[in-house]
């Protein structure tokens, strides 16, 4: 890439461009919308470069939250670079990483003076030297991990992102299920690709140590019978019978979350949005802090809400923390009643304060 040509023009506002294929019904919206809603419009002019083949109701909401909407579907990389330079964008923000529909090819041309990638779209480094910064925090990218990123780390204060729950859809927190059922229900709502042999082994050990407990695995990947059969067979290798498992898919997920007492995060690739949702529905989760970036998403979130005691650094500690949490039903019921309040009072819900620091 060639260095960005200096533009000799006095501007009253900095122009920020967000680039994404996900300006639609997508998990990113709960992280991005509160940012767009709280940008200081007296100092910043906000552009959305939307790589969309189809719009929906959420797209209309995004359009109302930005100053300029720029559809990019059908643009070649060079055509998009030309457009960005014509608009004199100052800071270009990638929200997709290497996920489907990304426009990293555009960033490779360095069309703006400053560019950055934010973890909410992917979680990994882009690998592009043309992108200047990676927005994260010091839990997801602790000291000593700089060499794992092609970008310079830009450590955001308190937490790497804010979050906005959909209260109308989520509803209220229910009574701890174990008080009615008489046994602990563990659960996860993650994608199947994150569930590997080590995760299944750890979950199996937890089930064996917590008498009569069950595990809910809810994911669209398990709509398919062959996938359900495959994962059941994996648990069977670790002596866990299928009657301890509830595997399937139900959407929206709130009623499933109401059946769960304790959520279990995956490793080395943590879950994402569902971790926030679990906490807001009163479900504590156990996470194993692993590789920088996607392996520390859970640790970053728990640190932000002041629940570092649910962060493990080894598989055995992960298992033991889950077992210990399940051993005191009354304490678990108290946690369920307090978690939503704890999240509301945490940095992830300080939307205005976060955006001021981001700016």
Regions found by a protein language model. Give the residues of each.
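Alpha-helical solenoid repeat scaffolds of the TPR/TPR-like class and their adjacent stem/linker regions
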Residues: 1-183, 201, 232-240, 251-262, ...
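Short hydrophobic "strand-cap" motifs at the C-terminus of beta-strands
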Residues: 19, 189-191, 218, 248
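A conserved nucleotide-sugar
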Residues: 43-45, 204-237
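Substrate-binding clefts and catalytic carboxylate motifs of secreted carbohydrate-active enzymes
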Residues: 187-198
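Short acidic/histidine- and often glycine-rich active-site loop of Leloir-type glycosyltransferases
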Residues: 295-306
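Conserved short loop/turn motifs at secondary-structure junctions
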Residues: 217-224, 247-250, 342
């Amino acid at each position: 890439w060639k260095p960005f040509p200096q533009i000799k023009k006095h501007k009253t506002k900095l122009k920020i461009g967000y680039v994404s294929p996900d300006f639609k019904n997508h998990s990113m919206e709960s992280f991005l919308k509160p940012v767009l809603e709280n940008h200081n419009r007296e100092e910043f002019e906000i552009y959305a470069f939307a790589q969309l083949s189809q719009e929906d109701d959420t797209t209309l909401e995004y359009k109302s939250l930005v100053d300029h909407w720029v559809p990019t579907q059908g643009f070649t990389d060079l055509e998009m670079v030309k457009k960005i330079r014509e608009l004199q964008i100052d800071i270009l923000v990638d929200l997709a990483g290497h996920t489907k529909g990304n426009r990293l090819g555009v960033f490779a041309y360095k069309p703006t003076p400053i560019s950055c990638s934010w973890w909410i779209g992917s979680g990994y480094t882009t690998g592009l030297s043309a992108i200047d910064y990676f927005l994260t925090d010091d839990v997801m990218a602790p000291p000593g991990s700089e060499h794992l990123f092609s970008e310079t780390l830009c450590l955001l204060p308190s937490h790497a992102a804010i979050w906005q729950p959909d209260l109308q859809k989520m509803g209220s927190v229910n009574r701890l299920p174990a008080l009615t059922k008489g046994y602990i229900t563990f659960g996860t709502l993650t994608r199947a690709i994150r569930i590997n042999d080590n995760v299944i082994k750890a979950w199996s050990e937890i089930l064996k140590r917590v008498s009569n407990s069950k595990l809910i695995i809810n994911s669209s990947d398990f709509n398919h019978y062959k996938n359900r059969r495959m994962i059941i067979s994996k648990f069977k290798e670790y002596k866990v019978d299928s009657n301890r498992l509830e595997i399937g898919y139900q959407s929206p997920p709130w009623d499933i979350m109401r059946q769960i007492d304790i959520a279990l995060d995956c490793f080395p690739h943590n879950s994402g949005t569902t971790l926030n949702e679990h906490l807001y529905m009163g479900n504590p989760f156990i996470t194993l802090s692993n590789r920088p970036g996607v392996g520390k998403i859970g640790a970053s979130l728990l640190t932000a809400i002041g629940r570092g005691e649910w962060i493990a650094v080894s598989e055995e500690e992960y298992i033991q923390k889950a077992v210990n949490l399940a051993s005191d039903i009354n304490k678990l019921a108290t946690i369920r009643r307090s978690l939503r309040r704890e999240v509301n009072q945490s940095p992830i819900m300080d939307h205005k304060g976060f955006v001021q620091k981001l700016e």
